[in-house]
């Protein structure tokens, strides 16, 4: 029988059940336990899923069965558990964003590299079959010269979403739409279109009074590939519609809606194109109408990849170093909105954007 890979989860909030279910449904993954600074919350989740509630992170890391630590803490609290886990020789998977600054992200990458452990990130939209088809077409040059890479996320979150947990209404915790929801789709543009050269953004709050966060963003990106990008993000647009990702080149256009390939047209039609047009699964909820309206299947692919990477000795498919450029774009968007002018990349950290 193949040896299982034990997982420990740090953080017992809204996202923890996604990790628990994903690990349980994986081949070779096993949930050892969960830790949260709220012992009551950890105990509730542990009881529901029949796993151990650790009293501290140190206790979790002292359990030799835990080989991988999944960090599911609030956005601004990823650094410490990642570094501690790495120093204890554990592989790490962190929720997005890796951190709220480039400096902390680099510190975490360095800690994992020094410890010789794998360090992956849940930007799980990358693993969707429609996205992988787009990626393959970009890399093979099938689009020709890239002209546009656009993301439209028109979602809805009620006021209660932001008031349900203290950190969700705090700007410094990365609870605005750009980080909390939009990060995934900015990541897809970076993943598909490549390095960004400059950004320009406007951020406002149009639907959640009394919350000091942006819930609506319109931005323009310029990529080294020559492509232009338009990004529209909102959690104020009831009832919420599926995300739309569009890639346009001189020789073709691909559009993903939700996780389904909506448009796949190229000047050089190929036999496999009809099958690609059928990619996706409309049955998985994609989060448009509420935080709970999301499936965990994409999380499971990332979990399964870590299990397989450990077994085979290879790197994970989404190492955090590949997500750092996305964080840089996101931070540049905040800087642009604050300065009310375009920002050229690369950038340096500016903590005042969270004031």
State where each predicted segment sits.
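Predominantly a Rossmann-like dinucleotide-binding segment in NAD(P)-dependent oxidoreductases
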Residues: 125-211, 340
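N-terminal Rossmann-like dinucleotide-binding module
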Residues: 1-49
């Amino acid at each position: 029988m193949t040896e299982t890979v034990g997982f420990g989860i740090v953080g017992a909030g809204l996202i923890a059940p996604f990790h628990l279910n994903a690990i349980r449904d994986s081949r070779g993954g096993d949930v050892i336990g969960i830790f949260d600074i709220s012992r009551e919350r950890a105990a509730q989740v542990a009881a529901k899923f029949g796993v151990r509630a650790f009293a501290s992170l140190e206790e979790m890391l002292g359990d030799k069965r835990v080989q991988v630590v999944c960090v599911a803490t609030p956005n601004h609290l990823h650094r410490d558990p990642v570094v501690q886990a790495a120093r204890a020789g554990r592989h790490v998977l962190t929720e997005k964003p890796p951190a709220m600054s480039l400096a902390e992200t680099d510190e975490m990458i360095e800690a994992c590299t020094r410890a010789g452990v794998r360090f992956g990130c849940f930007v799980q939209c990358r693993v969707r079959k429609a996205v992988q088809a787009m990626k393959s077409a970009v890399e093979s040059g099938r689009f020709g010269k890239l002209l546009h890479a656009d993301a439209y996320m028109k979602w809805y979150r009620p006021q209660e979403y932001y008031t349900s947990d203290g950190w969700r209404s705090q700007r410094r915790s990365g609870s605005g739409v750009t980080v909390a929801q939009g990060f995934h789709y900015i990541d897809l543009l970076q993943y598909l279109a490549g390095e960004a050269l400059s950004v320009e953004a406007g951020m406002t709050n149009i639907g959640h009074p009394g919350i000091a966060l942006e819930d609506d963003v319109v931005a323009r990106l310029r990529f080294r590939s020559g492509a232009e990008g338009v990004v529209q993000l909102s959690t104020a647009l009831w009832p919420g519609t599926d995300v739309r990702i569009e890639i346009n080149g001189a020789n073709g256009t691909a559009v993903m809606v939700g996780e389904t390939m909506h448009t796949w047209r190229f000047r050089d039609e190929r036999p496999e194109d009809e099958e690609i047009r059928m990619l996706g699964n409309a049955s998985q909820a994609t989060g448009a109408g509420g935080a709970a309206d999301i499936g965990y299947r994409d999380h499971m692919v990332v979990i399964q990849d870590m299990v397989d990477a450990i077994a085979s000795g290879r790197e994970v498919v989404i190492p955090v170093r590949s997500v750092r450029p996305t964080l840089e774009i996101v931070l540049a968007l905040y800087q642009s909105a604050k300065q009310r002018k375009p920002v050229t990349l690369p950038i340096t950290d500016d903590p005042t954007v969270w004031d």
